[in-house]
């Protein structure tokens, strides 16, 4: 049995201690926000926050998390959307949506650790977006950082010309 806190609730998993956190969350706790993408630490779709830091839940066994504090996308905020979620919507980041939860969790952890991240910190995020939403992701990070520093987000979409990055065809790769 492994005990931890998940989204503020005490949880005991009666599973093999070598069970990846991703499967404990999805199958035993019915928290399906963390996505299965690769099972090889390559995509970041399974990102959750463990003790304040972003962790790929496919790559960590529950046995190593005894007493840990886990936050999933379902527990990122209560009531109102988290500033990263608000910025994600305001910048219209989502395309296919598969990477959304992992990206949002990684960005929330990044902004908690580094309230005004530079391009190098943003580029170092391990998450991959295959849709090529990189420019919108960067704008969402900047918007969320500003909101977290100054208060509630504006929810209306500002009118602005499209950048050359947005009008270019999608590129293969991480989209960061």
Regions found by a protein language model. Give the residues of each.
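Signature of N-terminal electron-transfer/Fe-S-associated modules in redox systems
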Residues: 1-176
């Amino acid at each position: 049995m492994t005990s931890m806190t998940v989204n503020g609730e005490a949880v005991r998993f009666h599973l093999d201690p070598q069970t990846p956190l991703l499967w404990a969350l999805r199958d035993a706790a019915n928290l399906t926000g963390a996505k299965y993408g690769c099972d090889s630490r390559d995509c970041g779709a399974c990102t959750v926050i463990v003790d304040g830091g972003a962790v790929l839940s496919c790559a960590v066994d529950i046995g190593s998390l005894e007493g840990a504090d886990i936050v999933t996308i379902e527990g990122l905020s209560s009531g109102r959307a988290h500033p990263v979620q608000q910025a994600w919507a305001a910048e219209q980041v989502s395309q296919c949506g598969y990477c959304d939860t992992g990206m949002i969790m990684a960005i929330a952890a990044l902004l908690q650790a580094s309230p005004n991240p530079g391009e190098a910190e943003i580029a170092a995020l391990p998450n991959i977006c295959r849709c090529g939403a990189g420019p919108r992701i960067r704008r969402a990070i900047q918007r969320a950082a500003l909101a977290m520093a100054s208060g509630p987000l504006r929810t209306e979409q500002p009118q602005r010309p499209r950048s050359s990055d947005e009008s270019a065809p999608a590129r293969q790769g991480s989209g960061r």
